[in-house]
Amino acid sequence: MELNPVDSILSDRIQAIVATEKNIDDMMKCAREIMQDLGKEKQISKNKMDDNANSFKKLITQVENELSAQMQYLSHVCVGSSHQGSTFGVLQNSLLAQSGLSSLHSELAQILKNIEPPTQEVDEDNEDEEDSGDADMLEETPEDVVAPRTTSSSATTSDGGSGGADDAASSSAPRSQEERRSTEEEEGEQMEN
């Protein structure tokens, strides 16, 4: 069974903490010995006192260094900076990307909604007949003159026909001012007759 590199790093950190705990125990024993020696009526030799003081200082330095290293590691883990085994930064970047993507989708939907008004479905027969003439007219007319296309979804005639060519003229609104004028003139002539 192979150990994962992250597992070995974590086990090393745990072993370092255990070693620090043992050093703290040794430091407490050393301090207890010094206190007992000072409590005795008999004078302690200078060499023994220096040895006890040096071992105590050495243990304090080791414990302090190891605890500082562990605290620094934990502070990096808490703020999300890169460290061994951390997924906080990756998760944060993923969430940020997802929120950016969703905001882009909503902005795009809003733009499309403002640019293209909703269109109703056109009857297949009407669409085929209108497309041949509409494409030429759209190329010739400026954009600001083009009117939105309106269609009727129910194209039936009174005599039961399919509603193809007879209703083609009435199924879409005029696309330019010229076409509007010609349509109005035709309607005016029909009204007079």
Curated annotation (Swiss-Prot):
Say which domain of life the source belongs to: Eukaryota
Task: Output this protein's name.
Answer: Mediator of RNA polymerase II transcription subunit 11
Against InterPro entries, the record matches this protein to:
Mediator_Med11 (IPR019404)
Q: Which residues form a coiled coil?
A: 31-68
**Which compartment or compartments is the protein found in?**
Nucleus
Region (Disordered), start-end ranges: 115-193
Q: Does the keyword Coiled coil apply?
A: yes
GO MF terms listed in the record are: transcription coregulator activity
**Residue spans with biased composition (Low complexity)?**
150-175
Species the sequence originates in: Caenorhabditis briggsae
Q: What binding partners and quaternary form does the record give?
A: Component of the Mediator complex.
Keywords, alphabetical: Activator, Coiled coil, Nucleus, Transcription, Transcription regulation
Role noted for this protein? Component of the Mediator complex, a coactivator involved in the regulated transcription of nearly all RNA polymerase II-dependent genes. Mediator functions as a bridge to convey information from gene-specific regulatory proteins to the basal RNA polymerase II transcription machinery. Mediator is recruited to promoters by direct interactions with regulatory proteins and serves as a scaffold for the assembly of a functional pre-initiation complex with RNA polymerase II and the general transcription factors.
The keyword Ion transport belongs to this UniProt entry's keyword annotation: no
Task: Indicate, by first and last residue, each region the UniProt record lists as having compositional bias (Acidic residues).
Answer: 121-143, 184-193
Q: Please give an example of a GO cellular component term from this record.
A: mediator complex
Q: Give GO BP annotations, semicolon-separated.
A: regulation of transcription by RNA polymerase II
